[in-house]
Swiss-Prot record:
GO terms for cellular component: plasma membrane. Keywords: ATP-binding, Cell membrane, Membrane, Nucleotide-binding, Plant defense, Repeat, Transmembrane, Transmembrane helix, Transport. This is Pleiotropic drug resistance protein TUR2. It is a multi-pass membrane protein. SUPFAM superfamilies: P-loop containing nucleoside triphosphate hydrolases. Ubiquitous. Residues 508-721, 1168-1382 form the ABC transmembrane type-2 domain. One of its GO terms (molecular function) is ATP hydrolysis activity. The keyword Transmembrane applies.
């Protein structure tokens, strides 16, 4: 028997700690003990308490422990009732310092179990002959264009029906891989991007996507995946950080720990306690309390606290995780939360995917070291993929698994890996990390530089050959032998593999989910308060528009107005549920992650989201009823009021349920929005208000009977119109006015319909929520868009694997065709001259200071100064052909200095002297000769790489450069940064579609290079890249410098070879002061010599990274130890004097030179700027079918729905009801398609706006051409939309086919769709992001709905609101549409005894002779919204720098 569970909190909690053995005693007695009671008395007391504890039955014994209190007294504690302070004290005693005490603590845990002969359960994971293939489109078929979208959809339908092949080709991800991941050993997974690392980790953790074709098998301790629950036996830690932003770090980990439960720890502890009692062994009381706390359910906090400490997250434990909208923890901390989320559970095998991205090397070392201690001491199994492990982190691993192009190149002990490659003729250079070498040695482009056999010519060694050679290498042969001997299943520990699906009981899971949902509702209270405020505003408008003194009860028209008021109440609560859609979709990624990790079943997640929202519906509807019911003058009977209230609550709940369901089905905002609009459309149009029941066609009547709104409307109408207020008799048959109205509108005149409606709504509420649970269970998150591969990439992958000599489409890139060397060289022939000449320029800055207004929170803490100084007078010079690294730990002012020099700051105060080749810097001209590569690679997602570069060149190169030269120059730049093979690839959205991070970095550099700048600034060009990708980017940077340009890069944690590719270093310390400015020297010799000459600075170790050493020896704590200020040391050095002389020399213009001068601010004329922007917008729209194609599809479907529902209504005008129905068709179409247009355009404009900020700052164009292009590109798309909609609907509804009527109809529809779209764009331009824009815009849709003239006609609107009718664009559209179709008819109507023309004028206030004015007004609104959009884009900047 052994202690299976201890991997969780305690042991596997232990999973994080660090291996600096400390000699200090574990708990030295404090001095006060000497004067206190004698230790013998304490021992006696402890022995007595322990003896009492031993006598308790097992259940109680495991829930009691002995701890030493703050005052040294011995006390018995209840494990389940440990408070925060007690937990803190316990951890302080056990693991005071994570780096020093963790290993000793883990050893104590192990020793306690070994003393009584209990072993830890271990897991050996084997995979044999594993093949994994995917299917993808190759070449242009996969590029999303408007045409491809419809073609691919059609082919998909035909292939699903087996009528034709899908046209996808199989692509191999992993090819025949076999190996063993052993327990008690740390295995590092390495490989270049696209090698298949993530796929291998997912396969081993049993989490592969079911669309992949998999053969081969994976076993744990000889057991197949179907014999246990792999998701709970092992933990897969993803490279994506998906968390709920509104929860704190501690809450996130505690929830995870609570769901995962304690595994088998409790059973192990029972056995341990029994054996200790038999052997009469007394354990260490603190270790005993800890082990009991992590084994008893409900005490997850101890595990959480331990993991927080080990991961260094205790400093931000109570900070929100944060997301795009909420400011939270840093990216590096988020990465650690993702790791911690799985470490708090009891899993015994860990598969970790790139857990170090965004962490500095010391933190990565600390975390990996803690994992290593846990794996070694407690017998864990770990396979960890890291991007750029530093040499010291690399040395912590026992085994290396190297993958390349889906094959295993090496798997075995770390010590033998270099020996294997040397046997193949490749050697790792002195000053290169082994991990970096391993990432590059299998790559066609990077291999040659490592070839060492001088007597043999180099030839490319493909992956296949390495893989075959490894099988005959002694490590490979031994692995093969081990694999051929099956695992002895009798050695499998009973507690090693988990067989239960969930960690805790169903009731506990539900409680955990309820607690979390309640917490999130409290954190999101702003949303609920905002919704209530919005309701109050709408209620104020409703009660003053439908004011009781203005509402008599004399005839059917009066009843119609009351009916409108009821309809408004229902619709308001129906649409109020729309917020549920966005909120549900936002939470789905976290749900899918936790569902797949088996934290909880879908029902446990769905029930709390439903049940906890019920009280909110009561509050919202209560506010509405309280404000409107009696003011509008509905039936005063209290019972009827409460019935009205109940119906509103139910419709509100039905709406929430429906939108949650649509979120689960759509899973994406655009798709769900479209579904949402369809749902609202069918509910509304067929609900019985817009078109009466008798008028609904037979083939649509099912829609009427299945619309929840119909039941609500029937019930609410019956409740009101069968009341006392409406019992005035209207004819001899004894019919009351209320009954007559109900019959007239096709509503059932039976009082039981109230309860039928209530029953139906309850049924719908339950049904929608039940379906929500089912879809959460069935559906997986949407894929990463179309899987596409270019023909070239496929050939290159194949060539890499087999060594086939493919002539790749990489024109001019010698490196590809003949495997030329690609190390980052400083020397070599300088590439002089490209197609376009440029002037080399230097930039000098002397005593530059930058300050901002003192933040309010610092003033609150007693800081008296008004300004906060971020740069304290820095000086330096950057010269042509010299590559300068700008370095310093985070927060030292690197990016600030660069923004100041480049003129990118939008606020703050700048002082000091900045000169360009001796002349004072002028920002207008400087933008023309400089480039700035931002850290976040911001590009238009829907254009190709080549188009991005062509566009940048078009707008930034001088007007005299003709098109041919421009294209030649773009080709040269693509060559320089190795983008030729990606020429036709779509850029895509970062991390979602399109280019990889490293490819985006190179595109960012190329976009600046095609402007032919003399000075380039780059902000962290290598962050987030693996060693090989970083080398490719640095090679592009080096090539750029060698053309004679001035290049400055900020850089974070570089490897040795990247660091030494720089010529000079500009090192800053906290507070924005320089501490070293000068040349690096060969192998960093100048830098090392400078710092080692300072008294007390520790010498650099052999083969240590000088960049890491330099940051370590210049920290603030080192300054305190040495008692000096490095900034002072620098100011007193010869280096400082040399730099001052250099600045002086470069600050005087060379004789005969002229200051920079450009005749115009921009390189292209206003018209050319407009054309270029329009060209890019056209490309973007054409390749964005999820927007353009969805909109056309949506329009056609709505046109067909409307055309069939309102079939032939245009010819009917014998009664006023016919006219109202026809008007309803127009009102519903305008509102629906209009709002849909406004909603879907918002995310598009929002994404493009961030690109606009970058391009405008780069001096590509002024704001107006961009705004005009954005406005104009919509016109042809909306025109097509109008033609599709207009032709279908006009012919199906059967309006008169006269040219004037048809053209007026098309005119109004076109401009209405257009102004709605521009309104959506305007809302984004005036707000910081599309989320806020959607909320602001939605408020107006509701108000426009009231004043459109359909729910209440203009003559019936109280005089104090009538002005708003004229300010409502929808009212003008409805006026124009109704009058242009019906305004001239003089037929008499049967039910009101007046002509159509007179009825329109009396009841609706519409006059035919006013039509031209109406037409002009619709155009005015279109121009107004477009102009406000353009003005806002020009004047408002929501970017903060």
């Amino acid at each position: 028997m052994e202690i299976a569970g201890y991997r969780g909190g305690s042991l596997r909690g232990s999973l994080q700690g660090s291996l600096r053995r400390s000699v200090s005693a574990w708990r030295s007695p404090s001095t006060s003990d000497v004067f206190g009671r004698s230790s013998r008395e304490e021992d006696d007391e402890e022995a007595l308490k322990w003896a009492a504890l031993e006598k308790l039955p097992t259940y109680d014994r495991l829930r009691k422990g002995i701890m030493t209190g703050d005052g040294g007294e011995i006390q018995e504690v209840d494990i389940q009732g440990l408070g925060f302070q007690e937990r803190k004290n316990l951890l302080e005693k056990l693991v005071r310092n994570a780096e020093e005490d963790n290993e000793r603590f883990l050893l104590k845990l192990r020793n306690r179990m070994e003393r009584v002969g209990i072993d830890n359960p271990t897991i050996e994971v084997r995979f044999e002959h594993l093949n994994i293939n995917a299917e993808a489109f190759v070449g242009n078929r996969g590029v999303p264009t408007l045409v491809n979208f419809f073609v691919n959809k059609a082919i998909w339908i035909l292939s699903a029906l087996h009528l034709m092949p899908s046209g996808k080709r199989p692509i191999s991800i992993l090819h025949d891989v076999s190996g063993i991941i052993k327990p008690c050993r740390m295995t590092l997974l390495l490989g270049p991007p696209g090698a298949g690392k993530t796929t291998l980790l997912l396969a081993l953790a049993g989490k592969l996507d079911n669309t992949l074709k998999v053969t081969g098998n994976v076993t744990y301790n000889g057991h197949g995946m179907h014999e246990f629950v792999p998701q709970r036996t092992s933990a897969y830690i993803s490279q994506h950080d998906v968390h709920i932003g509104e929860m704190t770090v501690r809450e996130t980990l505690a929830f995870s720990s609570r769901c995962q439960g304690v595994g088998t720890r409790y059973e192990m502890l029972t056995e341990l306690s029994r054996r200790e009692k038999e052997a009469n062994i007394k354990p260490d009381p603190d270790v005993d309390v800890y082990m009991k706390a992590v084994a008893v359910e409900g005490q997850e906090s101890v595990v959480t606290d331990y993991i927080l400490k080990i991961l260094g997250l205790d400093i931000c434990a109570d900070t929100m995780v944060g997301d795009g909208m909420i400011r939270g923890i840093s990216g590096g901390q988020k990465k650690r939360v993702t790791t911690g989320e799985m470490l708090v559970g009891p899993s015994k095998a860990l598969f970790m995917d790139e857990i170090s991205t965004g962490l500095d090397s010391s933190t990565t070392f600390q975390i990996v070291n803690s994992l290593r201690q846990s794996v070694h001491i407690l017998g864990g199994t770990a396979l960890i993929a890291l991007l750029q492990p530093a040499p010291e982190t690399y040395d912590l691993f026992d085994d290396i698994l190297l993958l390349s192009d889906g094959q295993i190149v090496y798997q075995g002990p770390r010590e033998n890996v270099l020996e294997f490659f040397e046997s193949m003729g490749f050697k790792c250079p002195e000053r290169k990390g082994v991990a970096d070498f391993l990432q590059e040695v299998t790559s066609r482009k990077d291999q040659q530089q490592y070839w060492v056999r001088e007597n043999e010519p180099y030839r490319f060694v493909p992956v296949n050959e390495f893989s075959e050679a490894f099988k005959s290498f002694h490590v490979g042969a031994k692995l093969h032998e081990e694999l051929s001997t099956p695992f002895d299943r009798s050695r499998n520990h009973p507690a090693a593999l988990t067989t239960s699906k969930y960690g805790i009981s169903k009731m506990e899971l539900l409680k955990a989910c309820i607690d979390r949902e309640w917490l999130l509702m409290k954190r999101n209270s702003f949303v609920y308060i905002f919704k209530v405020v919005q309701l109050i505003v709408l209620a104020l408008i409703a009660m003053t528009v439908f004011f009781r003194t203005k509402l008599p009860r004399n005839g059917l028209e009066d009843a119609t107005i009351f009916f409108g008021a009821m309809f408004l109440g229902l619709v308001t609560h129906l649409f109020n549920g729309f917020a549920e859609l966005a909120m549900s979709i936002a939470k789905l990624p976290v749900f899918y992650k936790q569902r797949d990790l088996l934290f909880y079943p879908p029902w446990a997640y769905a029930l709390p989201t439903w049940i906890l929202k019920i009280p909110i519906s009561f509050v919202e509807c209560g506010v509405w009823i309280a404000m409107t019911y009696y003011v509008i003058g509905f039936d005063p009977n209290v019972v009827r009021m409460f019935r009205h209230y109940l119906l509103l609550v139910l419709i509100s709940q039905v709406a929430s349920g429906l939108f949650r369901l649509l979120a689960a089905v759509g899973r994406d905002m655009v798709v769900a929005d479209t579904f949402g609009a369809f749902a609202q459309l069918v509910l509304l149009v067929l609900g019985g208000f817009i078109i009466a029941r008798e008028k609904i066609k037979k083939f649509w009547i099912w829609g009427y009977w299945s619309s929840p709104l119909m039941y609500a409307q029937n019930a609410i109408a019956v409740n009101e119109f069968l009341g006392h207020s409406w019992n005035k008799l209207v004819d001899a048959t004894g019919q009351t006015l209320g009954e007559r109205f109900l019959r007239n509108r096709g509503i059932f005149v039976d009082k039981n319909w109230y309860w039928i409606g209530v029953g139906a709504l309850i049924g719908y509420m339950v049904l929608f929520n039940f379906l929500f649970i089912l879809f959460l269970e069935w559906l997986d998150p949407l894929g990463k868009g179309q899987t596409t591969v270019s023909e070239e990439a496929l050939q290159e992958k194949e060539a890499n694997r087999t060594g086939a000599n493919v002539e790749l489409a990489t024109r001019g890139s010698a490196a590809t065709s003949d495997g030329g060397s690609v190390e980052i060289r400083k020397d070599g022939n300088r590439k002089k001259g490209m197609v376009l000449p440029f002037t080399p320029l230097s930039i000098t800055f002397d005593n530059v200071k930058y300050s901002v207004d003192m933040p309010q929170e610092m003033k609150d803490r007693g800081v008296t100064e008004d300004k906060l100084l971020l740069l304290k007078g820095v000086s330096g010079a950057f010269r042509p052909g010299v590559l300068t690294a700008l370095m310093g730990v985070s927060g030292r002012g690197k990016t600030t200095l660069m923004d100041v020099l480049a003129g990118r700051k939008t606020g703050g105060y700048i002082e000091g002297d900045i000169r360009i080749s001796g002349y004072p810097k002028n920002q207008e001209t400087f933008a023309r000769i400089s480039g700035y590569c931002e850290q976040n690679d911001i590009h238009s997602p829907h254009v190709t790489v080549y188009e991005s570069l062509l566009y940048s060149a078009w707008l930034r190169l001088p007007a005299e450069v003709d098109e041919k030269q421009r294209k030649m120059f773009v080709d040269e730049v693509m060559d320089l940064v190795e983008l030729n093979s990606l020429r036709g690839s779509l850029v895509g959205l970062p991390g979602v579609t399109g280019l990889s991070t490293e490819q985006r970095k190179r595109l960012t550099i190329a976009v600046e290079l095609v402007a032919n700048p003399s000075i380039i600034f780059m902000d962290e060009p290598t962050s987030g890249l693996d060693a090989r990708a970083a080398a490719i980017v640095m090679r592009a940077v080096r090539n750029t410098v060698d053309t004679g340009r001035t290049v400055v890069c900020t850089i974070h944690q570089p490897s040795i070879d990247i660091f030494e590719a720089f010529d000079e270093l500009f090192l800053m310390k906290r507070g924005g002061e320089e501490i070293y400015v000068g040349p690096l020297g060969r192998q960093s010799s100048h830098l090392i010599k400078y710092f080692e000459s300072i008294d007390g600075v520790k010498k650099i170790k052999e083969r240590y990274n000088p960049a890491t050493w330099m940051l370590e020896v210049t920290t603030i704590s080192q300054e305190e130890i040495l008692g000096l200020n490095f900034a002072e040391v620098y100011r007193n050095s010869d280096l400082y004097k040399r730099n001052k002389d250099l600045i002086k020399e470069l600050s005087t213009p060379p004789p005969g030179s002229k200051d920079l001068f450009f005749a115009t601010q921009f390189s292209q004329s206003f018209v050319m700027q407009c054309l270029a922007c329009l060209w890019k917008q056209h490309k973007s729209y054409w390749r964005n079918p999820s927007y353009t194609a969805t909109r056309l599809f949506f329009t056609v479907v709505i046109a067909l729905i409307f055309g069939t529902i309102f079939w032939d209504l245009g010819k009917k005008r014998s009664t006023s009801l016919d006219l109202i129905n026809a008007m309803g068709s127009m009102y519903a179409a305008v509102l629906f398609i209009g709002i849909q247009n406004a909603q879907t355009v918002q995310p598009i404009v929002d994404v493009e706006r961030t690109v606009f900020y970058r391009e405008k700052a780069a001096g590509m164009y002024s704001a107006l051409p961009y705004a005009y292009a954005q406005v104009l590109i919509e016109v042809p798309h909306i025109l097509v939309q109008t033609l599709l909609y207009g032709l279908l609907v006009y012919s199906m509804i059967g309006f008169d086919w006269t040219a004037a009527k048809f053209l007026w109809y098309m005119f109004f529809m076109f401009f209405t769709f257009l102004y709605f779209t521009y309104y959506g764009m305007m809302a984004v331009a005036m707000t910081p992001n599309s989320d806020i824009a959607a909320i602001v815009a939605a408020a107006f849709y509701a108000i426009w709905n009231i004043f459109a003239g359909f729910i209440i006609p203009r003559p019936r609107i109280p005089i104090w609101w009538r002005w708003y009718y004229w300010a409502c664009p929808v009212a003008w559209t409805l006026y124009g549409l109704v009058v242009s179709q019906f305004g001239e008819y003089t037929d008499t109507m049967s039910d009101v005894d007046e002509t159509v023309k007179d009825f329109l004028r009396r009841f609706l206030g519409f006059r035919h002779d006013f039509l031209p004015v109406v037409g002009v007004m619709v155009v005015v609104f279109t121009v107004l919204f477009a102009s406000i959009f353009a003005f806002s884009i020009k004047t408002l900047n929501f970017q903060r720098r």
